[in-house]
Amino acid sequence: MFFYPLDHVAVAVTSLEEARSVFQLLTGDTCSTPEVLESQGVRVQFIGSLELLEPLGPESTVGRFLARRGPGLHHIAYRVPNLPQALARLKAEGVRLIDDVPRPGARGHMVAFVHPRSSEGILVELVESEAPVTS
């Protein structure tokens, strides 16, 4: 059996600046430099192992999420050493995937998402990384 360590928890926010100030006070962690992921329509910033997601527009995935649900938990992410292998194993076990093939994500890592219908309603991201990820 394989177990993957938790990489980060992501929160959808309407404003990185406003959310950053609150979460930095709560955690005391330092913030990464904000990063724009055009392909995903989002601006991200890490505070320790918390990822803040701000949509670039209302039609982005995170923009639609905010319109439907408001700010809050967006996904949890697990670190995997070999993403294609992890995806193949999950698919063979009948897990429904959003991404059959890894794609570029934040911090230069390749990522893929598991459909919430296969994970008790929670969007799960897999992040390819051997080492612990830091902001």
Annotate the PLM regions.
Residues 1-2, 6-14, 43-48, 54, 63-89, ...:
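Vicinal oxygen chelate
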Residues 16-17, 59, 83, 120:
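Alpha-helix N-cap/helix-start and coil->helix boundary motif
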Residues 1, 7, 19, 24, ...:
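A cross-kingdom feature marking solvent-exposed beta-strand/loop segments within repeated
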